[in-house]
Amino acid sequence: MKNWKTLLLGIAMIANTSFAAPQVVDKVAAIVNNGVVLESDVDGLMQSVKLNAGQAGQQLPDDATLRHQILERLIMDQIILQMGQKMGVKITDEQLDQAIANIAKQNNMTMDQMRSRLAYDGLNYSTYRNQIRKEMIISEVRNNEVRRRITVLPQEVDALAKQIGTQNDASTELNLRHILIALPENPTSEQVNDAQRQAESIVEEARNGADFGKLAITYSADQQALKGGQMGWGRIQELPGIFAQALSTAKKGDIVGPIRSGVGFHILKVNDLRGQSQSISVTEVHARHILLKPSPIMNDQQARLKLEEIAADIKSGKTTFAAAAKEYSQDPGSANQGGDLGWATPDIFDPAFRDALTKLHKGQISAPVHSSFGWHLIELLDTRKVDKTDAAQKDRAYRMLMNRKFSEEAATWMQEQRASAYVKILSN
């Protein structure tokens, strides 16, 4: 089974109060600006990370190291949640219900099955909902704040699209794990040297067979640390430029790094690679139609019957489709062209129109079809395959640039927020 409790932003749920003795008074683990992180938050996340790691067969570091990583994660979450509160970010119950339903669907569960599994694992459903709501707020704040700092220029899109079309590794997808050894803002040369030595030591451990996931949980300052540094699948161009260059010749199982960036030293493990065809073609259809719109002088049934009559006249040779369209069609954009809609991909049409059109054979006329616009008589004139590789490459290039810049900028943004916040850790 997928690690379904962590599907949304890698969150591990806070366990219910049955894990703690009722007589123990909750303590403050850290003060974060005008808020706090509670010991119960840390303990709950510790329980959940251990539960998830056990299910996944993932090794964990000692409790002190794991606790430090969890506390840092909760501090960062608290900082972003406070920003969300100031910004007035709200997640409606409808949005929350949809997100939870999607999590259940991704794991082939009904909502009742999901509730049962939560209860089995000792997780309160109300607590789960609240935590998902928090994670959605964190995601929205981070996405909004980081994206507005990003600009993708047309020249960048064109250059990357050209690269996608010419490089052999343009379609390569990699499954990666990541460790970040962070540097403070404006680090001294001594701090840089210390971080580099630590990163090199971790690389050596990993290459000598140490569990990379455990190393990530132990040392990484990245947001994916508690997931063992797992980044999942992505195309090489979606990665920060310094990663893409270093991974251009990487093979499955390779440990890559340390790679220096503005936020620290990065270490990558290539879990797997896979390729994908670069040629992209789509089917276009050439169709024409006659549209009748229900009105006070022609109701739905009358419109449908009129189209049946027109269809019979066309099939008997009394008239042609083009002539009937010019005479009867109420679509001002195509009536004068004999109902001709030109070449287009089916997905641009109304769903009911599209579904009827895709079932037709060349030269076939449909029965009357009802859509949001009215009643249609549709004829499929022809189909063709069109190479859309260039357009698809530009679209992919834009998304890759956004993902790449987001990844780079998000690390910087989070470092800035952590540095500017007042944080006092009260527990060891």
From Swiss-Prot:
Superkingdom: Bacteria
Keywords annotated in UniProt: Chaperone, Isomerase, Periplasm, Repeat, Rotamase, Signal
Enzyme's top EC category: isomerase
A GO CC term assigned to this protein in UniProt: outer membrane-bounded periplasmic space
Biological process according to GO: Gram-negative-bacterium-type cell outer membrane assembly; protein folding; protein stabilization
EC number: 5.2.1.8
The keyword Transferase belongs to this UniProt entry's keyword annotation: no
Domain PpiC: start-end pairs: 171-272, 282-382
Database matches in SUPFAM superfamilies: FKBP-like, Triger factor/SurA peptide-binding domain-like
InterPro entries linked to this entry: OMP_Chaperone_SurA (IPR050280), PPIase_dom_sf (IPR046357), PPIase_PpiC (IPR000297), PPIase_PpiC_CS (IPR023058), PPIase_SurA (IPR023034), SurA_N (IPR015391), Trigger_fact/SurA_dom_sf (IPR027304)
Catalytic reactions of this protein: [protein]-peptidylproline (omega=180) = [protein]-peptidylproline (omega=0)
Subcellular localization: Periplasm
Any Pfam family matching the protein: Rotamase_3
Secretion signal span: 1-20
Transcription keyword on record: no
GO terms, molecular function: peptide binding; peptidyl-prolyl cis-trans isomerase activity; unfolded protein binding
HAMAP family documented for this protein: Chaperone_SurA
Comment block on domains: The PPIase activity resides only in the second parvulin domain. The N-terminal region and the C-terminal tail are necessary and sufficient for the chaperone activity of SurA. The PPIase activity is dispensable for SurA to function as a chaperone. The N-terminal region and the C-terminal tail are also required for porin recognition.
Functional summary from the UniProt entry: Chaperone involved in the correct folding and assembly of outer membrane proteins. Recognizes specific patterns of aromatic residues and the orientation of their side chains, which are found more frequently in integral outer membrane proteins. May act in both early periplasmic and late outer membrane-associated steps of protein maturation.
Protein name listed in UniProt: Chaperone SurA
Organism this protein belongs to: Salmonella choleraesuis (strain SC-B67)
High-level lineage: Bacteria, Pseudomonadati, Pseudomonadota, Gammaproteobacteria, Enterobacterales
